[in-house]
């Protein structure tokens, strides 16, 4: 009597769609591209729903709207390939925003301690100056737009302003980044529309 063979465990979903896309390019088939698009949509939905779950119901509507918009862009960047300049730029904005939030909270704590204490210590005063200097130096490091490259159409500057991370990018790379950014935007809009339809039926 033959022994029963244990079936192999199922292959887990690939969180990096670029790996699937590279395999599809090697096989030369369109099915791999469909798998890559499906994996990207799954990762997009995962990151977006996880970000939405962190929003409190007691948050004001205006702040909640701003948080949802930021969650949409953040989930797009996390689901995209890390080789894309626009995804790295969006994630950099998320990290910078988080750093500014932590700095503001630290400044509030320092001010509370200064008000509570009759005589503020020199270390606390230095902390306040360091935070203020950091914010000023970050604003002073704003990079001016690069000069227009020879032979490129006038719409290139508009694309550089619209696509995150497009500043200083040559025109051929800018077109590639724009196409990938628009694909991610379309997937994000479809996801949000699906969520609206789902909750409207309930």
From Swiss-Prot:
Residues 1-16 have a biased composition (Pro residues). Coiled coil: none annotated. Residues 136-185 form the bHLH domain. Highly expressed in roots and at lower levels in leaf blades, leaf sheaths, lamina joint, stems and panicles. Residues 1-33 are annotated as: Disordered. Keywords: Brassinosteroid signaling pathway, Growth regulation, Transcription, Transcription regulation. GO terms for biological process: brassinosteroid mediated signaling pathway; regulation of DNA-templated transcription; response to brassinosteroid; unidimensional cell growth. Induction: Repressed by epibrassinolide. It comes from the Eukaryota. Plants over-expressing IBH1 show erect leaves with reduced angles of inclination. Atypical and probable non DNA-binding bHLH transcription factor that acts as a negative regulator of cell elongation and plant development. Binds the transcription factor ILI1 and forms a heterodimer of antagonistic bHLH transcription factors that function downstream of BZR1 to mediate brassinosteroid regulation of cell elongation and lamina inclination. Interacts with ILI1. Binds to ILI5/BUL1 and BC1. Interacts with BCL1 and BCL2. Belongs to the bHLH protein family. This is Transcription factor IBH1. It comes from Oryza sativa subsp. japonica. The lineage of its organism: Eukaryota, Viridiplantae, Streptophyta, Embryophyta, Tracheophyta. The gene is IBH1.
